[in-house]
Amino acid sequence: LRIVRHIPQYFYPQRQTKVMNEGCATYVHYTIINRLFDQGKISEVNMLELLSSHSNVVFQPGFDDPRFSGINPYALGFAMMQDIERICTNPTDEDRNWFPSMAGNNDPMGTLRDAWANHRDESFILQYLSPAVIRKFRLFRLSDIAADKFCEVSSIHNERGYAEIRSALA
């Protein structure tokens, strides 16, 4: 019985960091292959093959797509990492409002390293999921009460909705 109990305990931390681990891996891989290509160390043919593979990994089908099976942690993590880089280097007014401490700090790698070292998925999503990524993924929140005949769209793309979507996803 102890072995059966210890196996799930071993994998528990991986479930707490899936978006961050997969997002970090795809972001770093994408960054490295682009730098190598820019330096001429990867041919165009190999680059196209790598980008095709990468695109397949980070693909997020829409909720109405037959392939949809939930949010792809690779896609969400990668999008969030890229968005953090954008916020640090080229913020919008909305970014400055939502992320005053990192917007325009011009240190995306420092910001990402801090996030990787100090957050699990729940706190990472609560801290860094931006309205831009929420819109890109077309995220919304449904309230589905079994006794009710219909589902209610309870959080949409507005200030209150962004915060509620972040909280629900975390």
Regions found by a protein language model. Name each.
Residues 11-22, 66, 70:
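Short, charged/polar micro-motifs that form catalytic or ligand-binding hotspots
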Residues 9, 30-34, 85:
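Sec-exported extracytoplasmic/periplasmic mature domains
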Residues 20-33:
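An active-site-proximal "capping" alpha-helix that borders the catalytic cofactor pocket
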Residues 11-15, 35-44, 91:
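Inter-helical turn/loop segments and adjacent helix faces that build the functional surface
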Residues 45-170:
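Non-catalytic terminal regions of proteins
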Residues 1-8:
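Active-site-adjacent bridging/hinge elements
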